[in-house]
Amino acid sequence: MTQTNGFDALHAHAQRLRGAAIPALLAAEPERPTQYAWQVGPLYFNFARQKYDRAALDALFAIARERDLAGAFQRLFRGEQVNVTEQRAALHTALRGDLTDAPVASEAYATAAEVRQRMGALIQQLEATDVTDIVSVGIGGSDLGPRLVADALRPVSGARLRVHFVSNVDGAAMQRTLATLDPARTAGILISKTFGTQETLLNGSILHAWLGGSERLYAVSANPERAAKAFDIAPGRVLPMWDWVGGRYSLWSAVGFPIALAIGFERFEQLLEGAAQFDAHALNTPLEENVAVLHGLTAVWNRNLLGSATHAVMTYDQRLALLPAYLQQLVMESLGKRVKLDGSTVDSDTVSVWWGGAGTDVQHSFFQALHQGTSVVPADFIGTVHNDDPYAENHVALMANVLAQTEALANGQDSSDPHRSYPGGRPSTVILLDALTPQALGALISMYEHSVYVQSVMWGINAFDQFGVELGKQLASQLLPALKGESADVADPVTRELLSKLRG
């Protein structure tokens, strides 16, 4: 990005604005509170407290045009091989809508719709049995997305099926889950793209034995033959996924099977509808009015021009408490790259460390550092305008905290006592859902997906591979024999010492 024609001008704006007070920016642009705000379907965004002005934004958009961001969106949606290192398309958008005339994308959409029909039929069959509980086994993209959506949208009471998620290879996770269930009234779903994932295979074996066989086991995989063979699951209970959908983008596919079981098939389809509606905004809206583009460019601005190394996400709705963990994978696995598409080293920093939690709990843990620490941490504050629980006063208090915290972070407060002085200048974006509906959550997740893609295009990196996770898995596989007491050649001296401690 630093090699673009417009970077010097952008850098000059950053130098001008780095020390600017956010109240001064608001005073210089009196219409900023509304001009930097957008309503897209059920989502409202306000960027007025970010540390840029119109001139800096124009410079950002100029680089986005130089990077052919609009063309990059076309290539993504049309099913071109944007995942160049694996020579694959990234057609997660086709799982929820058909927005182009590209045959590849249209075929993917039709295939996904057919699999959803099969999934709906399996759900009807399950609901007609005496099964009351589902154990969903997966990890990473096979777990974080489904777990987030199921937790956010599950009924408060009266659910026909209860879904439990197990991801960690630590046996305690499976033990605690199964201890509360009756094997005669439980079914299991094993989700793995390759069906070679160690955690899923080990936990799947435990679940298979506990259930007494495969009669109530289902699977989702891009390798359905291996899935069926590994646990003797009938082919009719194995749903496919595809190599043109990355795990962290897959909740819209049959990986969403546990979502549909937890919230109902109709509401699962509404989730997809909401995502498709935001997809249309991302694909068809001019850059300057495109919220996904602005969100992504804001992240680039804060990372590369203002030097922020981390980004916080605070969800002021308890039902979205798992969103920060989901976004950690979506953002950091997608953007944690140090080489560009052509294999050369990047010329700027890439991904920030994403983290966060649920408000107001986090105000009593890490907000001290946000307000008075030495690091400036940009943040997203996410809340809901309307809440459907019966405790209206609580929701008012919750939203009062969103307003108060974002104002305090931005404006600060002087004091004669330095210990009680707040420097301010902490930028934030406020995102409000009209209500936490399937459509709104689908749109919100879609927005973050496209924001990630924007950042990858600006940095010239591949958002759709994850080779960084492989080395550790390979070494773990090689060390298993040594931990079991078998002879093994372990070259690393620290690993040898740790092995001796673990083996007693």
UniProtKB/Swiss-Prot annotation:
What Enzyme Commission number(s) apply to this enzyme?
A: 5.3.1.9
- UniProt GO molecular function: carbohydrate derivative binding; glucose-6-phosphate isomerase activity; monosaccharide binding
Tell me the Gene Ontology biological-process terms attached to this UniProt entry. Answer: gluconeogenesis; glucose 6-phosphate metabolic process; glycolytic process
InterPro entries recorded for this chain?
G6P_Isomerase, G6P_Isomerase_C, Phosphoglucose_isomerase_CS, SIS_dom_sf, SIS_PGI_1, SIS_PGI_2
Q: Which PROSITE patterns match?
A: P_GLUCOSE_ISOMERASE_1, P_GLUCOSE_ISOMERASE_2, P_GLUCOSE_ISOMERASE_3
Segments spanning the bilayer are none
EC category name: isomerase
Q: Where in the cell is it found?
A: Cytoplasm
Superkingdom assignment: Bacteria
The biological pathway it contributes to is: Carbohydrate biosynthesis; gluconeogenesis; Carbohydrate degradation; glycolysis; D-glyceraldehyde 3-phosphate and glycerone phosphate from D-glucose: step 2/4
Q: What's in the keyword line of the UniProt record?
A: Cytoplasm, Gluconeogenesis, Glycolysis, Isomerase
Catalytic residues at E333 (proton donor), H364, K473
Catalysed reaction equations from the record: alpha-D-glucose 6-phosphate = beta-D-fructose 6-phosphate
Short name of any one Pfam family annotated for the protein:
PGI
Protein purpose: Catalyzes the reversible isomerization of glucose-6-phosphate to fructose-6-phosphate.
The UniProt family comment states: Belongs to the GPI family.
The name of this protein is Glucose-6-phosphate isomerase
What is the organism field in this record?
Xanthomonas oryzae pv. oryzae (strain PXO99A)
